[in-house]
């Protein structure tokens, strides 16, 4: 990321093979350039998610009952999330803004193009494996040409995506146990609330009986 940021103009593209390009783009949003919420709130959500993942990873390592592959995949997702978070936190403070006309360069810390949490994420990999054309009868996209796989992404995006997909495929047991654990804690919480409510109502009944007598 540092090399691309300081050696490529924004939008510059280098062809490696017919199906592999290095394209320098920046985005404010999530993996693969998606964006649904404002930059600040996205960074805040990322921070909370990273803290939660660190806590969870420490917990499952300490428990010592989970498979190594599951621990590795959780760590892989965490590493990817931290990688993109570093861009958001520090790149705006360390570099000038990228432009199609000149290459960004490093500046004294705090004198960059954006404040803390507002930096843009650097993306660079694109794999346009093949093109296709939608059938004319297909709704909305009929007759249009598309490319698989066209989104520009970075290595951190790959860590998050590969980690999550691999967990869904190879770690279903651990994910089911995680879901059952949440359900049990929810049941315990509702049960304790019910018991406290029953105790409160029985206490009130006893007080009323004592007053009547």
Range-by-range predicted roles:
Residues 1-213:
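Alpha-helical transmembrane bundles and membrane-interface segments of multipass inner-membrane proteins
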């Amino acid at each position: 990321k540092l090399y691309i940021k300081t050696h490529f103009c924004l939008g510059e593209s280098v062809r490696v093979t017919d199906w592999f390009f290095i394209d320098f783009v920046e985005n404010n949003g999530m993996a693969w350039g998606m964006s649904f919420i404002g930059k600040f709130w996205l960074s805040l959500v990322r921070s909370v998610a990273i803290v939660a993942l660190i806590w969870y990873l420490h917990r499952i390592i300490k428990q010592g009952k989970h498979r190594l592959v599951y621990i590795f995949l959780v760590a892989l997702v965490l590493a990817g999330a931290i990688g993109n978070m570093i861009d958001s936190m520090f790149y705006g403070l360390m570099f000038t803004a990228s432009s199609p006309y000149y290459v960004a360069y490093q500046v004294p810390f705090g004198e960059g193009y954006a404040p803390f949490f507002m930096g843009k994420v650097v993306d660079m990999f694109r794999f346009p494996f093949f093109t296709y054309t939608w059938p004319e009868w297909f709704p909305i996209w009929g007759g249009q040409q598309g490319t698989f796989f066209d989104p520009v992404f970075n290595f951190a995006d790959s860590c998050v995506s590969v980690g999550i997909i691999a967990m869904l495929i190879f770690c279903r047991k651990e994910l089911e146990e995680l879901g059952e654990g949440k359900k049990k804690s929810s049941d315990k919480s509702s049960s304790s609330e019910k018991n406290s409510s029953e105790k409160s109502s029985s206490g009130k009944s006893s007080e009323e009986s004592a007053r009547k007598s």
